[in-house]
Amino acid sequence: MSMRTPEELSNLIKGLIEEYTPEVKMVDFGIVFQVGDGIARIYGLDRVMSGELLEFEDGTLGIALNLEANNVGAVLLGDGLKITEGSRVRCTGKIAEIPVGENYLGRVVDALARPVDGKGAISTNDTRAIESPAPGIVSRRSVYEPLQTGLVAVDAMIPIGRGQRELIIGDRQTGKTAIAVDTILNQKGKGVICVYVAIGQKASSVAQVLNSLKERGALDYTIIVMANANEPSTLQYLAPYTGATLAEYFMYTGRPTLTIYDDLSKQAQAYREMSLLLRRPPGREAYPGDVFYLHSRLLERAAKLSDALGEGSMTALPVVETQEGDVSAYIPTNVISITDGQIFLSGDLFNAGIRPAINVGISVSRVGSAAQIKAMKQVAGTLKLSLAQFAELEAFSQFASDLDAATQKQLARGSRLREILKQPQNSPLSVEEQVASIYTGTNGYLDSLEVLDVRPFLSGLRTYLTNNVPQYGEIVRKTNTFTPEAESLLKKAITDFLAEFGATKSN
């Protein structure tokens, strides 16, 4: 190897000096002066932004929520057991983001989209901000496609459309989660991506939902996001936004999605806990003043996108728990005013054996009727009115000793129509099966049967139609209308099966 001359070395060093560009990196550091209950107060951090991610010495992340004159109030995204007074904190210059992608399907993740199902890491290339702006007016189109729940009471009288926000509200133990899970099960084979967000629930309850979905092959198109009751309130507060972010990835690729928030009462309680610990002024029921914005910015992300954006959709089914049926409490009234309708579940109906325990009289869907398929409109047009009149007559008949024949007939018809709405859990029905059941009831074919025989008869009729008259189902599925041909096929099938059912009963 030849020796370099001093001139060559000098020129080489000069060249390197000329190429060198000094890189000055400023990092904003702060010092923790108080920590506890998932909250840290920090001196310094003069340039921190609201909602910015902070990184503590031990690797724990936090979010800056309170920017005060002398300190910053931050919530911790973890237990923070190793954070002490005097620990250093640095700004990251980022807001909270999570990875998103196809590989999340069939997985169970926490509020930061980290897998918790023991199936290993989730590989993905894309990320999205947890707090994303909702689509604007120009980015949306009106709801026009149905999202079938598989429940006769909902699809016939409180129809839901893709891109709608429909509240499920009721007391504890009235079947709110059951309706949500049935809706997920009914999306099988329809290309809808489902996200189930469990907020502040027992791990055993989430495991039950997971098993229901797994047994029926619904986990393949579902993501479960969980922030259990034993997790920090920060994670319970973030979980719904994480669920919405995961669903948004699929929505913006032009696919229909369904997001269930179970339940937003617990998220509001977690946010109240955080706000009180941050010493924000309490308002009604000790909730902070921005608790309405907490839910509105979440639910406004549900939309039916315009053609230009790929016509994807996110349908939101938020769940809210009431106390003793009181829908005038703060959180229920807030969410009712944000959503496009509500399915109200009654404890009295549940205890009377009417399940799903939907109170059809006060449940409403504000935009879903535009999305209801024509076949259902044709057969279920008068169903809600008939049931409302029946409920009124039933209450009146308790005080009347003798009733005329017309009233007795109306009461008999009403009690049979109510049987049509009863459905066992995890047994969603297809549209053609629902249409057949409603048509049978509204046209008086069930009047000759005992009330207790109605459900066995309808179950048998559905099997009879599938095995012996498959062309009826094909017509309704393909045309989405109840054509004269479909009606004549159904009439004949009902008449034939009535005779068969009567013969079986007499034997």
Swiss-Prot record:
GO molecular function (one): ATP binding
Cross-referenced PROSITE patterns: ATPASE_ALPHA_BETA (PS00152)
InterPro entries: ATP_synth_asu-like_sf, ATP_synth_asu_C, ATP_synth_asu_C_sf, ATP_synth_F1_a_nt-bd_dom, ATP_synth_F1_asu, ATPase_a/bsu_AS, ATPase_F1/V1/A1_a/bsu_N, ATPase_F1/V1/A1_a/bsu_N_sf
UniProt KW Ubl conjugation keyword: no
The entry's keywords: ATP synthesis, ATP-binding, CF(1), Chloroplast, Hydrogen ion transport, Ion transport, Membrane, Nucleotide-binding, Plastid, Thylakoid, Translocase, Transport
Matches recorded under CDD domains: ATP-synt_F1_alpha_C (cd18113), ATP-synt_F1_alpha_N (cd18116), F1-ATPase_alpha_CD (cd01132)
Site (Required for activity): 363
One Gene Ontology term, aspect cellular component: proton-transporting ATP synthase complex
Locations listed in the record: Plastid, Chloroplast thylakoid membrane
Residues noted as binding ATP in the record, renumbered to the chain: 170-177
Main location: plastid
Pfam family, one: ATP-synt_ab_N
Catalytic activity annotation: ATP + H2O + 4 H(+)(in) = ADP + phosphate + 5 H(+)(out)
EC assignment: 7.1.2.2
Family membership: Belongs to the ATPase alpha/beta chains family.
Listed HAMAP family: ATP_synth_alpha_bact
Described function: Produces ATP from ADP in the presence of a proton gradient across the membrane. The alpha chain is a regulatory subunit.
Protein name per the record: ATP synthase subunit alpha, chloroplastic
Organism: Tetradesmus obliquus
